[in-house]
Amino acid sequence: SGFGKCSLTVALPILSAAGIETSALPTAILSTHTGGISGYTYRDLTEDMRPVMKHWKSLDIKFDAIYTGFLGSFEQFFDAFRQEDNLILVDPVMGDNGELYTVFTREFAAGMRMLCQKADIIVPNLTEAALLLDEPYHPGPYTHAYIESLLRKLGALGPQKVVLTGVYFKEDE
């Protein structure tokens, strides 16, 4: 996103401060983040990614980890750069507050579910969890039993670890 405190503008400084060397491959360009700002522009960069990936492969570049956020499509980046010992972390950015972002379709959510099967770690918010599981969104507050059920079902998709964001519990729990 060109404007807004999200995406690469937030992730890269944090990763750098942690001493992690990064290589960025933008998957899309948005004029602003999608949360609460209407009229944003969006361009999928999948076609632009292919020559970058081809060049990186020709250089025999290896990655210790692959971290995805907002994706325009499901280009097979993981398959091209997956190694036995690298970590795959997927933030399945698709929606918030019970709503799928307008640039995405339900079919996109199904594709994201398949991508999460290849991940070691997934980091969905509660909207994205509902979309990944093809279940209705529950706005909360949440019970421990409900969150544990979501975590089990998300784990059954295939990742080794699931970090669920946006969770808050009833005051009496």
Residue locations for each model-derived region?
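Conserved N-terminal subdomain of the carbohydrate kinase-like
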Residues: G2-T102
